[in-house]
């Protein structure tokens, strides 16, 4: 079928692009004895433009008739898409509008909505094992849509805060008061450890303690950083301890919204995969 063939071509090209970026440094090292690294800039500039057409195809897959490749109930889906576009546009405006953020949210929510509509439009809702097997492809698409929303929010709408603090200082993070409690140093067998302790939301009786620090390895003269992470259902907050200057410690705080949606989407896709395997 034309739709499935186009989707297959997109994912083949995506796989080959990732494979090229992975093995290219190895080829260069073998042929020219030079070491290079292929990182984020390559994958962001090549994989993402290829993935977007794939996700666009996925967004219309639930509403296609696989016998005729025509859209079923087109008026219903067009109306739903227009309403969703307006809602996402309003939401993006209040989240500091960003073009990629708008595209990502619209794509993710549309995949979710189209899959849900397809489930309720195409099948009689009878909760049994056969029902879950029949709707399994749509469930997988819902998982992808949720993951897209999580990836978009955590990358595009990330908020970064910088502070210069003394021990005992209080500062505000996302409307919550945080106490920079103290700095602790310890000597381990092969490294020296520096730990900054933070108390999050100290206005409540049950404040949460977060540790962020650095390790210094004298033999290799290498310093590694360990971020303190506060997990919440709608965001992850990262505390990063920097260097000390003029008796003040530099502290960076990153707020990544809806990281949990990425994991939720992956779990749903894993569930869908297990159901698909069990059918064989």
Locate the predicted segments by residue.
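Hydrophobic alpha-helical membrane-insertion segments
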Residues: 9-19, 143-147
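Short aromatic-rich membrane-water interface segments that cap or initiate transmembrane helices
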Residues: 8-9, 35-51, 252-256
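Residues within alpha-helical transmembrane segments of multi-pass membrane proteins, especially transporters
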Residues: 17, 24, 53-56, 63, ...
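Membrane-helix interface motif
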Residues: 19-32
């Amino acid at each position: 079928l034309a739709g499935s063939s186009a989707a297959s071509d997109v994912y083949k090209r995506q796989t080959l692009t990732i494979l090229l970026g992975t093995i290219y440094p190895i080829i260069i090292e073998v042929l020219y004895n030079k070491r290079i690294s292929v990182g984020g800039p390559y994958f962001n500039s090549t994989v993402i433009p290829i993935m977007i057409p794939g996700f666009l195809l996925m967004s219309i897959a639930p509403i296609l008739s696989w016998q005729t490749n025509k859209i079923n109930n087109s008026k219903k889906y067009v109306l739903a898409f227009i309403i969703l576009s307006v809602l996402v546009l309003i939401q993006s405006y209040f989240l500091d509008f960003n073009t990629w953020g708008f595209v990502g949210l619209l794509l993710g929510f549309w995949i979710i909505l189209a899959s849900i509509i397809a489930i309720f439009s195409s099948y009689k809702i009878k909760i049994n094992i056969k029902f879950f097997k029949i709707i399994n492809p749509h469930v997988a698409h819902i998982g992808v849509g949720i993951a897209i929303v999580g990836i978009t929010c955590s990358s595009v709408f990330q908020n970064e805060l910088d502070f210069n603090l003394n021990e005992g200082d209080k500062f505000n993070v996302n409307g919550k008061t945080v106490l920079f409690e103290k700095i602790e140093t310890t000597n381990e067998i092969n490294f020296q450890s520096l730990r900054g302790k933070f108390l999050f939301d100290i206005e409540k009786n049950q404040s949460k303690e977060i540790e962020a620090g650095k390790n210094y390895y004298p033999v290799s003269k290498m310093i590694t950083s360990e971020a303190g992470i506060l997990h919440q259902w709608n965001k992850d907050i990262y505390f990063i301890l920097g260097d000390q200057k003029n008796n003040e410690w530099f502290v960076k705080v990153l707020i990544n919204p809806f990281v949990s949606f990425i994991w939720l989407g992956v779990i749903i896709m894993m569930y869908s995969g297990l159901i698909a395997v069990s059918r064989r």
